[in-house]
Swiss-Prot record:
The keyword Metal-binding does not apply. Residues 193-297 are annotated as: Winged helix-turn-helix (wHTH) 1. Residues 298-370 are annotated as: Winged helix-turn-helix (wHTH) 2. Residues 1-187 are annotated as: Interaction with CTC1. Keywords: Chromosome, DNA-binding, Nucleus, Telomere. InterPro entries: CST_STN1_C, CST_Stn1_wHTH1_sf, NA-bd_OB-fold, RFA2-like, Stn1, Stn1_N, WH-like_DNA-bd_sf, WH_DNA-bd_sf. This is CST complex subunit STN1. It comes from Bos taurus (Bovine). Residues 57-157 bind DNA.
Length: 370
């Protein structure tokens, strides 16, 4: 019981799991790692990889074993890193129809034959043999002490020249490097840790946390514009920026902030505002004051001008059907509004306009206005 309670203390609280995108996705993991996942002590059926909560996975491999039961197939799947058992439920056969008194019409016969062909195709792709390539998406379960996958979706992959397998081999290392191998850090936990245990964050982490808190302050108070010096007078933000940080020799920040000098505080606020700029949440206008920042979501004039640009451009013959591409809107906005308008700021404005139903995304990166 003591080991179980200590394990729960090391885990991220279950209420915060939804903040990690990996929790809601089908994690593309190597089978070796699926077999080595640590099970949660809070919720059964949830596992952890490097702090990421995982409940469903996506695998691709070769069938090396087949067992058929009345209700399901049991496939042993090998992806060259390990072997795991996959329970793939059989699809119900609804082709049997009750005896009908009326003779079916030619159209009904045609639909019935097409449906039968479709069901035969599905059945062929659902029943696999040893040596076939299978893709499985499902939940991780324990059965008689062995870990297995209960499939929600599975199918045979036609891959005669190994294109799909090669693409998977190239995709997984990048996903691991960018997502799975990056520890999950909840902003809420970071804030609690920083406030309760001063000095537990490095400079970069403290800057990111300050940026998040500044964003919350701007949204809650509906701030339209601000100077950096004004943010530095907000007590909650200032107390956070005053936290001591862990020194990092490798990043060249040794001795940066042992004391809470005004210059150090000014620097961390400047970097936090820069992060907000990179996200497109705040921006500066050409020809304006150097230290004056505008909040993107509160600049209604900018929203109206971007909306008008999309309306006018969508009336032109080459944009009537499909709408305007994001880069075309950006070029027009830079030409007529501000040469320094950034892509993140425009993306924020387009998202706000779409949320208000002023514009619609017709296809990826294309927008039309009403």
């Amino acid at each position: 019981m003591e080991s179980n309670s200590s394990q729960c203390e090391d885990e991220t609280p279950s209420l915060l799991w939804g903040l990690d995108p990996v929790f809601l996705a089908f994690a593309k993991l190597y089978i070796r790692d699926i077999l080595d996942l640590k099970e949660s002590g809070q919720v059964q059926g949830v596992f952890f990889y490097n702090g990421h909560p995982i409940k469903q996975v996506d695998i691709l491999g070769t069938v090396i074993g087949v067992r058929e039961k009345d209700a399901f197939y049991s496939y042993g799947v090998d992806d060259s890193t390990g072997v795991i058992n996959c329970i793939c439920w059989k699809r119900l056969n609804n082709t049997k129809s009750s005896s009908a008194t009326a003779t079916p019409s030619a159209r009904e016969l045609s639909l019935t034959s097409q449906l039968k062909k479709l069901q035969e195709t599905i059945a062929q792709r659902a029943k696999l043999e040893i040596g076939d390539i299978i893709r499985v998406r499902g939940h991780i379960r324990m059965f008689r002490g062995e870990r297995e996958i209960h499939a929600t979706t599975y199918y045979k992959v036609d891959d005669p020249v190994c294109n799909v397998q090669i693409a998977r081999m190239l995709e997984l290392p990048a996903i691991y490097r960018k997502v799975y191998d990056q520890p999950f850090h909840s902003p809420a936990l970071k804030e609690d840790e920083a406030l309760s245990n001063p000095g537990t964050l490095d400079l970069d982490s403290l800057t990111c946390l300050l940026s998040e808190k500044a964003k919350e302050f701007l949204v809650e108070n509906r701030v339209q514009s601000f100077y950096q010096q004004e943010l530095e007078t907000v007590e909650s933000l200032l107390s956070l920026a005053n936290q001591p940080v862990i020194h990092s020799a490798c990043s060249g920040q040794m001795g940066f902030k042992n004391d809470t000098t005004s210059r150090a505080i000014h620097s961390i606020f400047r970097n936090a505002v820069k992060l907000l700029q990179e996200e497109g949440l705040v921006f500066q206008k050409d020809g304006g004051f150097d230290n004056l920042f505008y909040v993107t979501r509160e600049d209604k004039e900018l929203h109206r001008k971007i909306h008008r640009i999309i309306q006018e451009e969508c009336q032109k013959p080459n944009h009537v059907e499909k709408g305007c591409h994001f880069l075309h809107i950006l070029a027009c906005a830079r030409l007529s509004l501000s040469p320094g308008l950034s892509e993140p700021v425009l993306q924020q404005v387009l998202q706000l306009l779409e949320d208000q139903s002023d514009i619609v995304s017709t296809t990826e990166k294309y927008y039309t206005a009403f």
